[in-house]
Amino acid sequence: MSYDASAIRVLKGLEGVRHRPAMYIGGTGVEGYHHLFKEILDNAVDEALAGYATEILVRLNEDGSLTVEDNGRGIPVDLMPEEGKPAVEVIYTTLHSGGKFEQGAYKVSGGLHGVGASVVNALSEWTVVEVFREGKHHRIAFSRGEVTEPLRVVGEAPRGKTGTRVTFKPDPEIFGNLRFDPSKIRARLREVAYLVAGLKLVFQDRQHGKEEVFLDKGGVASFAKALAEGEDLLYEKPFLIRGTHGEVEVEVGFLHTQGYNAEILTYANMIPTRDGGTHLTAFKSAYSRALNQYAKKAGLNKEKGPQPTGDDLLEGLYAVVSVKLPNPQFEGQTKGKLLNPEAGTAVGQVVYERLLEILEENPRIAKAVYEKALRAAQAREAARKARELVRRQNPLESDELPGKLADCQTENPEEAELFIVEGDSAGGSAKQGRDRRFQAILPLRGKILNVEKAGLSKALKNAEVRAMVSAIGVGIGGDGEAHFDLEGLRYHKIIIMTDADVDGSHIRTLLLTFFYRYMRPLIERGHVYIAQPPLYRLQVGKKVEYLYSDEELQARLKELEGKHYEVQRFKGLGEMNPEQLWETTMNPEKRVLKRVELQDALEASELFEKLMGQEVAPRREFIEEHARYAELDI
């Protein structure tokens, strides 16, 4: 094929967005789909941050479309002389356009690249924008980025009404049969309500006939307390740090618990920065410096014994760090990591100075926090030997792998799969049925320790936990911690394979709790999966098929009315012979795997605490609330 001018294609307008959507929204799966909603919501939130909007309505419509409406100023509708088009049309049809580029329009905004509105428009089957401004109701419509109805006045605006209403339906040509998930919408609205204290957000779910209002006046301090819900608190009232350095506004809410977990959520201009950035690094550093400085001055620092590290000082801390700044620089369009050095400088200075004041004003709390860090240092030292199990010269060649691990032959972690299997009998079938070239099997005996109730040192004394830590090879902890190293990951797919009954569900929950609390980066990077073993074996004549749910079975039996068939229900993995287990659950060509994803850290943390934590009352409430949805297998 010749490579000349004829081979070069220029993508015009928004065609490039439709051609390569992942460049703009990170992918065309569930996350990318909901990213469209977040982009339009961000625009409405920007109006609130600028002081012009006090209420945002989000409506999930019966046809699957979504409406976002604010009571701000309304997108400008006058002509742009250089474009010869109304401003609202330019914003929705041109990349890198919008008020965010004009210094006076928005002091702070989350819409960094000026592509949000136009990208949503390009990736939607249709979009309708209505503007209420200067007493008039304006409307313009689009389809897949092209204008289908030019801007026109469709009537008078209700008296005093201003703002923008955007309704859009993501394009099935891009996203297939995906739909909006109300829980994801709810989670983001709740997040925004905490981050913009006093902003009223209303969610109308027309598909399920529900309406919810999110409004919080406590801001990030309330957010931190919600994050720690269900934990035993070291003190009741969360602290709030607020300050400005240069053009950067800093807000931090924090609270200490008696538990072993730490949770720090970070935001820049209301955008969740899942991968942290300069503000997170500066917060951790300033927090540690202030605590150490106070401890030294107050004589709390004992020279004997292990000294607290940064991780020890953070143990039990629940914090929310929010910065607002002009011209934020993020890594990638999906805004996962903040890069601005001035954000780090501001957070470092504001947090260090104000935290020292808080510690000096609250000596009893300061002493309790530092003594907890000293205990964490002692526990870390006690766990050091256990951690040595997972330090390897070569992650794929080690004499310290657990004896019951049936390892695979490949030395390429990207090809390797680890099946964590419930019970020795199922483990035996899995070992015989697997493809030993790339599949490893680790059978677990009985139920593993509930790490939500146990500390790290106790967890590392548990044989099943130690076997998993040793086999997986990354250590324990989070990104950037000395004892956690993703480079050591021996298997890029870690597959939890348990029975489809109540006991299996419990073991699966215990394992997920372990991964969430002590190996969360594996979940965040998509390495943890749940196998879906079949519930039924259906034989019609000589033909055998496997069914994975009661609904699937009922639908199939309806088709077979009047015919002779045999149905076998699998109560556990051990009932399947090695060939059946391979064919139904392990064969990459035929199996069904569910990837474990972490969309909302606050919701996940609360759920694990409710299900697996010390407090009985929240667990009882959860069970009573969800009992009507349960399927009993008695």
From Swiss-Prot:
Binding positions (Mg(2+) 1): E422, D499
Biological process annotations from GO: DNA topological change; DNA-templated DNA replication
Temperature-related behavior of activity: Optimum temperature is 65 degrees Celsius. Active between 25 and 77 degrees Celsius.
Residues annotated to bind Mg(2+) 2: D499, D501
Protein origin, superkingdom: Bacteria
Class of this enzyme: isomerase
PROSITE patterns linked to this entry: TOPOISOMERASE_II, TOPRIM
Cofactor binding remark: Binds two Mg(2+) per subunit. The magnesium ions form salt bridges with both the protein and the DNA. Can also accept other divalent metal cations, such as Mn(2+) or Ca(2+).
Names of required cofactors: Mg(2+); Mn(2+); Ca(2+)
Annotated Toprim domain residues: 416-534
Quaternary organization: Heterotetramer, composed of two GyrA and two GyrB chains. Non-hydrolyzable ATP analogs induce dimerization, novobiocin also induces a small amount of dimerization. The two subunits form an intertwined dimer where the GyrB ATPase transducer helix of 1 subunit connects to the Toprim domain of the other GyrB subunit through a 10 residue linker. In the heterotetramer, GyrA contains the active site tyrosine that forms a covalent intermediate with the DNA, while GyrB binds cofactors and catalyzes ATP hydrolysis.
Other observations noted: For the electron microscopy studies a GyrB-GyrA fusion protein was made with a Gly-Asp-Leu linker between the 2 subunits. It forms the expected dimer.
Annotated domain remarks: Consists of 3 domains; the ATPase domain (residues 1-220), the transducer domain (221-390) and the toprim domain (391-634). Removal of the N-terminal ATPase domain (residues 2-392) increases ATP-independent DNA relaxation, showing it is not required for DNA binding or cleavage, this enzyme still has some supercoiling activity, but in this case it introduces positive supercoils.
Family, as annotated: Belongs to the type II topoisomerase GyrB family.
Record's protein name: DNA gyrase subunit B
Source organism of this protein record: Thermus thermophilus (strain ATCC 27634 / DSM 579 / HB8)
